[in-house]
Amino acid sequence: MTRDHFRSAQMFAEAQKYMPGGVNSPVRAFKAVGGDPIFFLRGEGALLFDVDGNRYIDYVASWGPLILGHAHPLVVRAVKECAEFGTSFGAPNELEIELARLLVEALPSVEMVRLVNSGTEATMSALRLARAYTKREKIVKFEGCYHGHADALLVKAGSGALTLGVPTSPGVPEDTARNTVVAGFNDLEGLKELFARLGEEIAAVIVEPVPANMGLVLPRPGFLKGLRDLTAAYGALLVFDEVITGFRLSYGGAQNLYGVQPDLTCLGKIIGGGLPVGAYGGRRDIMEQVAPSGPVYQAGTLSGNPLAMAAGISTIKALAEPGVYEALESKTLRLARGLEEAAARAGAEVYITQTGSMLCVFFQPGPVTDFAGALRSDTARYSRYFQALLERGVYIAPAQFEALFLSTAHTDEHIDRTLEACEEAFRFAFSG
């Protein structure tokens, strides 16, 4: 059954001459699962095709943006038509207005929005704005929540549950990390203790409302509302990082699904339809502090570039059609339940989480409610599972602690074939 990956291996060897590790984002190097990364040639719907001619059912979806699948005709047409008029102007264009309007209309908490080029830019800019607005310096983040690679957010917990952050990457100054406080996700009581101690110094709490970078961890009932109430009581801002969940869990995002309105929202991925994009937005009185309306500086050469705007507009309009999210939820539930049954038949001890069109298979009995729980997963078994699926034509995240994504392009046939492959992969992963 071994597939030929000769051209991919050649390309990886060549890539390592010119790029650190041969990739432009670390997870792509397959370090967490072993072997060499696959080089892809094209995508079509729910399928990916590599440079060696192998075909895969794709559940990575470019790490989430491709909710309509690869090369969706509406998105491709929009980008082609836009490119005929130019790829970038470095000046205002009408498409910026249209995308901004769609975002404001979809998210009740967002009255104004600033478009940027990535999720990292969005979170970095939102936290600068929060600090300026509140005139405070400390930021609270949660263990296991990823908010991009800005220095202030590349921190981990220290020796205690409620400690100041310490750098998790060389090159991050300790002085920068000291203003980031790390708390446990889903631990509202612990957060209350933290605010009792530091509340007057905290500018903002930033959170993935549904974390998708420690696997997929669901918020406990009342946790998000508790964050809203606590931050409001202390005059801190609540920032939802919806770079992944925005327009993924519902039309708008997790805040629409859970009925909790943050002060600021960070977006990315889906709102660019597969092109580089980010955005941050929120209450008018806060957003009017951003230059040139106010003193908080943020800028970008390619911010609001027409190609990303066109791709995002066409994607969001397609998602606004009746029944789209219901259909996505239905097929994802079918896959999740099928995986549970396949694992049981194979004697595989796994714990599956699912919401909307996202899911995760933790290689442990569960439950998983926080970062510490996620870390109990058997990453060696996950690696065997990943490699077995790759050989059977199913492409999932090359790391245990990532979510899987479905798209409107996935069919019942794709799911049936996936479940058949997964049962075999479970047997292989738990055979040794």
Curated annotation (Swiss-Prot):
InterPro entries: 4pyrrol_synth_GluAld_NH2Trfase, Aminotrans_3, Aminotrans_3_PPA_site, PyrdxlP-dep_Trfase, PyrdxlP-dep_Trfase_major, PyrdxlP-dep_Trfase_small. Its EC number is 5.4.3.8. Pathway: Porphyrin-containing compound metabolism; protoporphyrin-IX biosynthesis; 5-aminolevulinate from L-glutamyl-tRNA(Glu): step 2/2. It catalyses: (S)-4-amino-5-oxopentanoate = 5-aminolevulinate. The keyword DNA damage does not apply. Keywords: Cytoplasm, Isomerase, Porphyrin biosynthesis, Pyridoxal phosphate. Gene3D superfamilies: Aspartate Aminotransferase, domain 1, Type I PLP-dependent aspartate aminotransferase-like (Major domain). GO terms for biological process: protoporphyrinogen IX biosynthetic process. Its cofactor is pyridoxal 5'-phosphate. It is an enzyme of class 5 (isomerase). It is found in: Cytoplasm. The modification N6-(pyridoxal phosphate)lysine is found at K269. The keyword Isomerase applies. It holds the Pfam family Aminotran_3. GO terms for molecular function: glutamate-1-semialdehyde 2,1-aminomutase activity; pyridoxal phosphate binding; transaminase activity. Belongs to the class-III pyridoxal-phosphate-dependent aminotransferase family. HemL subfamily. This is Glutamate-1-semialdehyde 2,1-aminomutase. The lineage of its organism: Bacteria, Bacillati, Bacillota, Clostridia, Thermoanaerobacterales.
